[in-house]
A protein has these predicted regions:
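Core transmembrane alpha-helical segments of multi-pass membrane transporters/permeases
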Residues: 148, 153, 163-178, 186-190, ...
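Membrane-interfacial loop-to-helix junctions in multi-pass transporters
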Residues: 132-137, 197-211, 237-251, 282-288, ...
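Hydrophobic mid-bilayer segments of alpha-helices in multi-pass membrane transport proteins
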Residues: 37-41, 62-78, 101-111, 136-145, ...
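Conserved, well-structured core domains of diverse proteins
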Residues: 1-130, 136-140
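Hydrophobic transmembrane alpha-helices that form the pore/transport pathway of multi-pass ion
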Residues: 232-300, 310, 319, 489-521, ...
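Transmembrane alpha-helix interface/packing and boundary motifs in multi-pass membrane proteins
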Residues: 219-223, 254-263, 295-301, 386, ...
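Long, contiguous bundles of hydrophobic transmembrane helices that form the permeation core
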Residues: 2-35, 327-430, 533-621, 648-666
Length: 667
């Protein structure tokens, strides 16, 4: 089977639950259940706007209603008949009707269970903290429905992982001594998950029901306004006149949009449908074009100030101020994109890319004339977050409200009053997969909390690493990548943070450093084979082999794998230290990334042989190791090889002919 034929079989939308929901909404126009789902999504967004302005409800109500809306949306848009016996009974109307009836029963049970759970929490003081049968019933129903909805939207990995942790909680006394615990009954587990702050409605659901949803809504409104087109146009207008312009424009546009929407796969599909064909048309290989888009879109989740939803989860877990997390993430994120940009420029020379036709490059002045209003929207968000230092929830709310107000000045009328309801519906559909991921992660975190497996696992990891930091970091990175292969970034981060981050903190890392390390590798799973969803999406658009695209993405995004280890050993990379230390570390890292990029891509003014590539990579690694001697050694290696390649470059074509002639003479 050829690569081309193989790629045609890739269903890009199926790689991301948000894209699948959007496709369902588009295909199901006129379907009464899809219309019901649209109403539910509108009500969900209205609920969050109301609580954003007038104050949050009691935690059990706020988080319960939030979860109830998401579960209802999934049950309406992802009916059972699409996931069970779909081939055998696909054309049976009776089977479809039975499945729809079953789903509606689950919807009713969802809201009954949410009401029972909040009633238990509300009346618990009167009952002297004792729970009733309602807590057990609510917990059992919610766990079953959450797992089923997760199966329909996220696949089997997330619900199976949650079930493994529940089984661990049940089997405590019967396990080997090293991992044994007191054990809990099924009734106790159900009550805990329904009513405890470490259960389904714990920290993860709290962040989802407040900040994350608000930023999802902001992203939906911004997308509806046409901001993505403006970002694409401005990126091309700034970079289009240089050879590497098409690829660099993808890096810029995808990074900016990915920071807001928080989904690497959705961002690849959103911006990649424009950037990938553009790169291919200029001479880049298809796998390289897909890899660039995947790396740039994935990096959006680590790019301040929004960082997808990661920064807000870190605020909850580390109890650090939002501004502190943003500042700490600046240099690592810039190094990630610097590595990608240098790799793009190297590959441009290797591939003999042609310049864009000047007619296809929009003029910056014209782009800004039409799109300056988008800068006002971003300015409102940045002012609220960084200057006024409003809470992230309030900042996102005001930025969302700024969209329809600012767009009144848009001459093209791309956003009108009629656009608001559709943007609100899109907000609900975009959020549902995040909510279900957070709910499943809440089950895992709850089981970790009551069993103490996080402490047990952490102690085992420290013992296996003999108390050394590097092996512990390596094990944590691998675990995060494996978790992220089948889970959304938020869920992978939450689970890894609850199990692995405490042990890294025990080894001496600051809480913020440990959590940022975990979050980085949870994000990088999107481009890491064998299950690299962002790279697969890019391959689907580029019509090339997904595995070669994933490998190309890893080469392009190598800085993302190096930088987290570097900032664990050198806090100055996270802006923790004197100004001199921060500048020194930043310069060393910039040079180190450039050297390593040359090694990975095999180009520095001239093609590098394998020995030169290995030496360049080694030199770059030395620049990442803290210390003056290692920096000097790295610079000496780089300077020596640079001199060699300058001489090759000066000889030009004659150098190639001489080498070819020498080979022929040897033969």
């Amino acid at each position: 089977m050829s690569d081309k034929k193989e790629i045609k079989e890739i269903d890009v939308a199926s790689l991301d639950s948000e894209l699948a929901a959007a496709r369902t909404l588009e295909e199901g126009k006129g379907d009464k259940f899809i219309m019901m789902a649209s109403v539910v999504a509108f009500l969900m967004t209205s609920f969050h706007i109301y609580t954003g302005f007038f104050g949050l409800f009691d935690y059990s109500v706020q988080r319960g209603v939030h979860l109830g809306f998401a579960l209802t949306l999934i049950l309406l848009t992802q009916p059972l008949y699409k996931h069970v016996f779909k081939d055998k009974f696909a054309g049976s109307k009776a089977f479809r009707a039975a499945c729809r009836t079953f789903d509606m029963i689950l919807v009713i049970l969802t809201w009954v269970s949410v009401w029972m759970a909040q009633d238990e929490v509300h009346h618990r003081p009167e009952r002297l903290s004792k729970t009733t049968w309602m807590a057990t019933f609510a917990g059992a129903c919610l766990v079953i429905i959450v797992l089923e909805c997760a199966r329909r939207t996220l696949g089997y990995i997330m619900p199976v992982l949650a079930l493994i942790f529940i089984a661990y909680a049940l089997a405590g006394p019967n396990l080997p001594l090293a991992i044994a615990h007191r054990g809990y009954s099924l009734e106790r587990i159900c009550k805990f998950l329904a009513t405890d702050l470490d259960g389904l409605f714990g920290t993860t659901m709290s962040v989802s029901a407040t900040v994350i949803f608000m930023f999802v809504m902001f992203g939906a409104f911004l997308e509806a306004s046409g901001c993505s087109d403006f970002i694409n146009d401005i990126a091309i207008s700034l970079t289009g006149k240089i050879k590497s312009g098409p690829a660099l424009s993808a890096v810029v546009a995808s990074g900016l949009m990915g920071s807001i929407n928080g989904s690497a796969v959705a961002n690849v599909v959103g911006t990649g449908t424009f950037t990938i064909p553009l790169m291919k048309s200029r001479g880049y290989k298809p796998q390289f074009a897909g890899g660039v888009e995947a790396v740039a879109s994935t990096g959006g989740q680590i790019l301040p100030p929004v960082m997808g939803s990661g920064a807000f989860l870190m605020v909850a877990f580390t109890e650090q101020k939002y501004i502190a997390i943003v500042i700490a993430a600046v240099i690592p994120a810039l190094l990630y994109y610097w590595g990608c940009a240098v790799a793009v420029m190297s590959q441009t020379e290797i591939a003999h890319v042609t310049l864009m036709d000047p007619k296809d490059i929009p003029k910056s002045r014209e782009v800004m004339k039409d799109g300056w209003i988008y800068l006002l929207i971003i300015a409102v968000l940045l002012y609220c977050l960084l200057v006024a230092q409003y809470s992230p929830l309030y900042s996102a709310l005001w930025a969302t409200c700024a969209v329809p107000v600012v767009m009144l000045f848009d001459k093209k009328k791309r956003f009108t009053l009629k656009t608001i309801p559709s943007a609100m519906v899109k907000s609900g559909f975009s959020a549902m997969s995040i909510v279900i991921g957070c709910a499943c992660a809440g089950i895992v975190v709850g089981m970790v909390s009551i069993t103490g497996i996080g402490v047990i696992f952490g102690d085992m990891m420290i013992q296996a690493a003999h108390g050394l930091l590097f092996p512990s970091l390596l094990f944590t990175a691998i675990t995060c990548i494996v978790l992220g292969m089948g889970l959304p970034t938020t869920a992978a981060y939450v689970i890894a943070a609850s199990i692995l981050a405490p042990s890294l903190i025990k080894l001496g890392l600051a809480p913020l450093t440990a959590h940022l390390f975990v979050f980085y590798f949870a994000c990088l799973s999107a481009i890491t084979p064998p299950v690299a969803l962002a790279a697969y999406a890019g391959a689907g658009i580029a019509k090339t082999n997904p595995m070669t695209t994933a490998v190309e993405a890893c080469k392009l995004g190598f800085a993302g794998f190096m930088v987290p280890f570097a900032f664990c050993y050198n806090p100055a990379m996270m802006m923790q230290g004197s100004v001199g230390e921060i500048i020194s570390v930043a310069i060393s890292a910039i040079i180190g990334v450039a050297i390593m990029s040359a090694g990975f891509q095999g180009w520095l003014l001239w093609r590098l042989n394998w020995l030169e590539r290995i030496v360049f990579i080694a030199g770059g690694l030395l620049m990442f190791i803290p210390g003056t001697l290692t920096d000097i050694a790295g610079l000496v290696i780089a300077a020596a090889l640079l001199l060699v390649n300058v001489k090759k470059w000066e000889k030009g074509p004659k150098f190639i002919m001489d080498k070819h002639k020498a080979k022929q003479e040897q033969k």
